[in-house]
Amino acid sequence: MRRMVMVWIWNPLIVNSTFDVGDDGICLKSGKDEDGRRRGRVCENVVVDGCTVFKGHGGFVVGSEMSGGVRNVSVSNCQFLGTDVGLRFKSKRGRGGVVENIWIRNIAMMDIPTEPITFNLYYGGKSAVEVLESGEKVPAKVEPLPVDETTPCFRNIHVKNLV
């Protein structure tokens, strides 16, 4: 039985857990678009250690619904086996929110069919494998938009010892 659990929680500790969900494995979110910015419920002070993710779109994922912000996250000593992407950061223009102070270290990845790490700030709702299989092309030129509160921001992301 496939089940996704979404909760509002602060200071979570996710340790020695196994995920096999067929979607994003360990996924941090904090609200969507204007409603997420208005509520301002930051997903923060997260510790993920010693977890294993089988299959799915991403092993560790932030977004795409991250308008309230995500900060102070430590991910270490995990295995991602057969996920489409290992580390996946996604959002889109108009969403807003700040993702910052993310530390990722000692991650083992096997049988990843696309990239070990992706940042997609024009996320359209499809996994990396779905985009590749569809033959869709990334537009050669994206219409520039002004930087404002609806512009997502990713900063201070540290990655070390990926194998």
What feature does the model see in each segment?
Residues 1-163:
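Extracellular/periplasmic carbohydrate-active domains that bind, remodel
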